């Protein structure tokens, strides 16, 4: 059985990706900070072999331990790494920002992705045409008002994806960068620190992406033949033109 590692798997994109890959016949390695949610998800994913572990990707030693602790039958059959864990915290001018928020975003979105990729790539090397899929953002393609550090972190993901594609070319590992636009998940609740009213307004007047849209995109990427590599995908709602312009009704 082929296995896929998914970070940030307890909700949003990660949860939907797990469900979609189960339907493709993948075994699943699911990492997230909230083990209770992973346990609930594991009970629902009855079609596949599902391995779960609590993990904060900001902790390099914990990342290394989680990968080294994988059972042999799983570690020998890792065919995909999906670096999904990420977040935005706060939105406003840089001079009004909080360094704790900056560190949380950089440590999760950038350093966490690096730690996980560094630990898992040696497992992917065993399987030609395996995948690293990085969840970036439209914020990794452009910047918007109040996005400063979050946009910077996702620009870093975009750059790391391009660099990995060079680094892993001779190892025959495919690297894809996915840049979603506005998607209705817990993202805005986290960004606005639990302010549900402000978070809801983000999606008013148009139909945003759903987590399932991203999961289906990843299923398409993984299902391409060996000679086809999807390098970069920007996916937005039909009502979105760029990082900040929407056709709201």
Protein language model annotation of sequence segments:
Residues 10-11:
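Conserved glycine-rich cofactor-binding loop
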Residues 54-66, 99:
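The beta1-alpha1 cofactor-binding region of Rossmann-like NAD(H)/NADP(H)-dependent oxidoreductases
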Residues 117, 153:
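Active-site helix of classical SDR
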Residues 137:
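Residue(s) in the substrate-gating loop at a strand-loop-helix junction
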Residues 26-40:
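Conserved glycine-rich Rossmann-like NAD(P)H-binding loop of the short-chain dehydrogenase/reductase
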Residues 92-94, 101-104:
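Substrate-binding pocket helix/loop in short-chain dehydrogenase/reductase
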Residues 177-178, 197-244:
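C-terminal helical subdomain
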């Amino acid at each position: 059985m082929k296995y896929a590692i998914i970070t940030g798997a307890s909700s949003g994109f990660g949860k939907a990706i797990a469900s979609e890959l189960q339907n493709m016949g993948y075994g699943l390695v699911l990492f997230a900070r909230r083990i209770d949610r992973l346990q609930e998800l594991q009970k629902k994913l009855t079609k596949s072999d599902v391995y779960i572990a609590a993990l904060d990707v900001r902790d390099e030693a914990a990342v290394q331990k989680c990968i080294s602790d994988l059972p042999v039958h799983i570690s020998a059959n890792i065919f995909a790494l999906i670096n999904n864990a990420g977040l935005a915290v706060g939105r406003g001018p840089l001079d009004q920002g909080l360094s704790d928020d900056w560190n949380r975003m950089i440590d999760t979105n950038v350093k966490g992705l690096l730690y996980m990729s560094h630990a898992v790539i040696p497992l992917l090397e065993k399987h030609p045409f395996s995948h690293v899929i990085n969840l970036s953002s439209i914020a990794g393609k452009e910047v918007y008002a109040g996005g400063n550090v979050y946009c910077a972190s996702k620009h870093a993901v975009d750059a790391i994806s391009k660099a990995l594609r060079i680094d892993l070319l001779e190892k025959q590992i495919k690297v894809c960068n996915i840049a979603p636009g506005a998607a209705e998940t817990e993202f805005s609740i986290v960004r606005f620190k639990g302010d549900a009213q402000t978070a809801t307004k983000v999606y008013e007047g148009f139909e945003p992406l759903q987590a399932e849209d991203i999961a289906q995109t990843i299923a398409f990427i993984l299902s391409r033949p060996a000679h086809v590599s999807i390098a970069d995908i920007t996916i937005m709602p039909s009502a979105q033109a760029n990082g900040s312009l929407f056709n709201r009704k």
